[in-house]
Amino acid sequence: MSPQPPSPTSAPAGSLTHLAVAGYRSLQQLTLPLGVSPLGGQPHGGLTLVCGANGCGKSNLYRSLGLVAAAARGDLVAALAAEGGLPAVFWAGPERTTREMHRGEQPVQGSSGRREAARLRLGIAGETLSYAIELGYQSDDHTSAFVLDPEIKREWIWAGGPFHPRSLLVQRTGAVVERCGDGGRAVPIALEVSPHESLFTAASDPLEAPEVFQLRRTILSWRFYDSFRTDRQSPARSGRIATRTPSLAADGGDLAAAVQTILEIGDAEAFQAAIADAFPGCHLTVDTSAPLFQLQLHQPGLLRPLEVTELSDGTLRYLLVAAALFSPRLPPLLVLNEPENSLHPDLLAPLARLIAAVAERTQVWVVAHAETLITALEDGSDCRLLRLERELGATVLPGQTVLERAAWRWPA
């Protein structure tokens, strides 16, 4: 029996339509269309599948979306510092390339000086609200030891997808955040904002700036799952004191509580069907007799269930992905980075069916490397496939038309 999409809670409306990145690692200038949630009534399903050879920039896309979430949380500078700071994350290639460079007739080389200041730009376009941020080096105080810290130069929030000055709702320039009122009149709503603080934390009052509050709340509800640890000391095997858990933690440490929550208030029947689809004849229970819940996998032919400490890495990782996807509280965006890691090839078809089922209810972004999973998702679901390549060190989407690239416009 193939898994059915979880049913208790629908995802919020307002799906992403585009992700735009400029100046970040291999993403010199890239705009990607995203599969839109079927709740929005769009032609594409809710699944975006990003694939490509090693080194093509898949992980950079995953990280760039995570940086947008970090801006909403208020820890963007810390997130960039964890990646090595601006010197490590800026596009390392030339500011401009020539036709001769692309044809191999001229070596790739930079000019004697930059025409424009180095900038890192991130942007998301949504059905209802869109956002962009621009960061760069500090422009003054060169005596400080923190001169290489990222500085937020500008931010914008506007209505709808494609940017137009008349659709601008909130903008931040330097230390001032303004709300754009009727007739283009700008009203300051935050002054003396730190160059390291996003408008999401500086001006998120629901009455004074409802757009900021609404978009921040949406972004904070995104969920990212990247390479669950399954070693003997991993949080997923160690567990933690159980409380009701409508969303699995990013480290999987609350797996038993998350499964018990699914069994109590989620779609328990579909969840067990998904487990049986991957492991025929098996089902899950949770021992709730102690504050530290114990997950148990029942297998045909065994006289007792297996506890999480006894499971193989691949089995545990599949259970973690299943628990994340069957959350009773679906997010507006669910991002999975190479969920097929450490899984036996026989589990990839059930995994594809599980992902496709959840994409019927909310927007799902999958970064995948295994061709078996990619083919299964292509064949079994309505997905938008983005197969990336590298050209002169830059990540590109082959075949993208001028009109498709023009669907995103950076605010000025």
What are these language model-derived features?
Residues 13-19, 113-122:
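Short, hydrophobic/aromatic-rich segments at coil-to-beta transitions
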Residues 25, 66, 312, 340-341, ...:
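Catalytic acidic motif of RecA-like/P-loop NTPases
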